Amino acid sequence: MTELLADEVFKDRVRIFQEYLEHDTDDANVTLYQEAILRMLNMGQRRLIVNIDELRDYNRELADGVLLKPLEYVEPFDEALRNVVSTLIDPVVHKDLKDKLFYVGFRGSFGDHHVNPRTLRAMHLNKMISLEGIVTRCSFVRPKVIKSVHYCEATKRHHFKQYADATMNGGLSFQSTVYPTQDENGNPLSIEFGFSTFRDHQSISLQEMPERAPPGQLPRSIDILLDDDLVDTVKPGDRVNIVGQYRSMGSKTSGNTSATFRTVLLANNVVLLGNKPGLGNVGGGALDITDADIRNINKLARKKNVFELLSTSLAPSIYGYEYVKQAILLLLLGGTEKNLTNGTHIRGDINILMVGDPSTAKSQLLRFVLNTAPLAIATTGRGSSGVGLTAAVTTDKETGERRLEAGAMVLADRGVVCIDEFDKMSDIDRVAIHEVMEQQTVTIAKAGIHTSLNARCSVIAAANPIYGQYDIRKDPHQNIALPDSMLSRFDLLFIVTDDIDDKKDRALSEHVLRMHRYLPPGVEPGTPVRDSLNSVLNVGATNAAGVSTENVEQEVETPVWETFSSLLHANARTKKKELLNINFVRKYIQYAKSRIHPILNQATAEYITNIYCGLRNDDLQGNQRRTSPLTARTLETLIRLSTAHAKARLSSVVEVKDAKAAEKILRYALFREVVKPKRKKHKKQRLEAGEEFDSEDDNSDDMDIEESEEEMDTNMVIDSGSRRVTRSQNATSQSQESGSEIGSSIAGTAGSYNVGTSNTQLSWPSTHSTLPATSRELASSDRNINTGTSVASEVSASVSEQSTVSLPREKMSVFMARLASLTKSELFSEECASLEDVLESINNIEDDVGFSREEAIVALKEMDAQNKIMFSDNVVYRI
């Protein structure tokens, strides 16, 4: 009698739920579920999402029954849905859904049933609840038997058995899950797989969101069971909102002897949230771009300065770093990857490395990328191992099988990996990411597992120099503790230094103080700012991506421009500063990256070829040094940067102006000037010796240093008190009086002569260490000024004299002895010194013997022939 009554109650509930699904209304705010069922069938889905708020308005008893007694109300609701589907399904159009099971999922306001893993209590058992958290683990998808059919060869009969346990939503009472292998007479049974029913089954772990965990406490976790169509809907790292039934099961380790039980959540609906806090309900981190957004994107792309607008709008709270922000924008856009028919893969992702002084906002730029990119994973050098970045072989705690555990770079496939403190990573761990950064795969051959995983991600890393602070007097490779094999894999290497500049420091301090004085709108001064965390009680109400399709018309257009803010518009009193809204920038980047695939035209290809050949073959000028080696990867870098710049313009063709913009950024990142310290030691020696030294000579030397190479080729100015003499490069007919006047003027400022064998040699302060090579040669030729002849005649005389000059053996021995002592001094701290510095230091030694420039050249060439030193291009190298 009780079973008949329960059956009647079940049928009555099925009838009421079916009436609810079939009811019609004129209210535009109420969902018509017959249309929703048709959309579900056309999309090939098997789960209808029902708004529990609308069900509460229709019948309060049904809504309360679903929340408080899901075991009794969910199964009749599923049965009612299957009855409605049977009347609407088309066997021709929906042939793939024939004989499939359909389910009902719930969304809406759950009230006090909206909890998190920390607030779950015993009173929530067997209730319908809603949970928010981060997925930390996903198991393999395995089949679970629901109904098995067995055949007995001895009796020629079929045996049938249904299975039900605590992890199933069915209305059957819990039965034994023992799999039969023989009948009651002991005859063996063989399973008929064609008549049996299996269901996909997966378990995941949901962890409490770290920003919601109390201070000083670890986030808590709970196991979630996914069945049938819900499997593989999430991956580790996703922020999700899961609706389901909170169940208690037997103890997993000690059977039924323990009074404590294992609890799980049987999922009913899974809503993907944004991968970052504060982004709202955005499935899988992908933003929902509306038609209005596309119109605004195309309108903005027609602006000539769209690239500058986008780069300026990135991290507006960070002052300066124009080129670095442009490079980060290109990294977010990415190039175009190539997969050739012969199996070759050419990556399209851009890698960036920032090396520089502490407190230069490197980590803040990484955090901005982490919060802006749709998929980004952050890690640190010390906190990451090689297997943690790539993949590790672990043991499954449920089955004991060996399985692969994906690392950070595999999880960030099609995303960005942010690595801070890159220089602190050990060499063994750093080698593990070589393959990822170029081939973009992870090859594993461990514990009997041999496989290759995709890791198509961009890498942006920050590192500190070897000495803690960047030494501008040393070459870049002496400051960066990374091998060339690693540096060549980074497309751009930026050296960020903390330069001392009064104007820049004042602007920076004003910018930082504005940030500290910033007060959110609606907050009274003096009150603490508390994070509301945007708690979402209406589950799935704003998500239209595969979960709720009823509110598509209610989408709000994303604003394009940022409203005026004293924080973001700092230092913009006189010039109008335009900033784009960061949410609109996210949509613009997502649209350009997914929709635009530019191609190279012939003119751009030739221009890029010329740039690459020029970078490879041109000599470095003056004190310039390369930050990273120039290899064939540099050519691919130019192509990737040009393609990304074309994407920023939403152009389908990479034009020459894109290549010019890429060249500008690459040259900024590639070349670094090395400043050699001024040698003041010899000046002090001359002062101690009692010789006069005019301080105005420092000013004249400084002025000469600041002059550009082009100006020094055409004009050189020498200041001495009130006298200024200008010598043009094409002056060939100066008078002898003017030459004598120049000589006397220089004598009055320089202070000392050293008489050689053929002409008068001036002793100049060392300024050539900071001059470019071409300027150094010009300046050195200016030192040999003959007081009795013109410049042109002096040059010809010096050339003829150099060819006939000879050096006695005694004088050669003195020169070699003096040079041997100099090679051990500070002059050769860089393993080389210019000819002028060497000659000046040799002649400054207190002795009667002096050397002219021509004699020094003859002596150096003879020592070079004896392999004692190397002399080339007026530079002496120590061996």
Swiss-Prot record:
Predominant subcellular localization, coarse grouping: nucleus
Statement: the UniProt record of this protein carries the keyword Cell division: no
Annotated catalysed reactions: ATP + H2O = ADP + phosphate + H(+)
Pfam families xrefs: MCM, MCM_lid, MCM_N, MCM_OB, WH_MCM3_C
Chain intervals for the UniProt region annotation (Disordered): 679-778
Compositionally biased spans, kind Polar residues: 754-778
Amino-acid positions noted as binding ATP in the UniProt annotation, renumbered to this chain: G356, D357, P358, S359, T360, A361, K362, S363
Biased composition (Acidic residues): 690-713
PROSITE patterns noted in UniProt: MCM_1 (PS00847), MCM_2 (PS50051)
CDD domains per UniProt: MCM3
Cellular component per GO, a single term: nuclear replication fork
Record InterPro entries: AAA+_ATPase, MCM, Mcm3, MCM_CS, MCM_dom, MCM_lid, MCM_N, MCM_OB
EC number: 3.6.4.12
Cellular compartments annotated: Nucleus
GO MF annotation, one: DNA replication origin binding
Signal sequence segment: none
Residue positions of motif Arginine finger: 488-491
SUPFAM superfamilies associated with the record: Nucleic acid-binding proteins, P-loop containing nucleoside triphosphate hydrolases
Function recorded in the entry: Acts as a component of the mcm2-7 complex (mcm complex) which is the putative replicative helicase essential for 'once per cell cycle' DNA replication initiation and elongation in eukaryotic cells. The active ATPase sites in the mcm2-7 ring are formed through the interaction surfaces of two neighboring subunits such that a critical structure of a conserved arginine finger motif is provided in trans relative to the ATP-binding site of the Walker A box of the adjacent subunit. The six ATPase active sites, however, are likely to contribute differentially to the complex helicase activity.
SUBUNIT field: Component of the mcm2-7 complex. The complex forms a toroidal hexameric ring with the proposed subunit order mcm2-mcm6-mcm4-mcm7-mcm3-mcm5. The heterodimers of mcm4/mcm6 and mcm3/mcm5 interact with mcm2 and mcm7.
Family from the record: Belongs to the MCM family.
Protein name: DNA replication licensing factor mcm3
Chain's gene name: mcm3
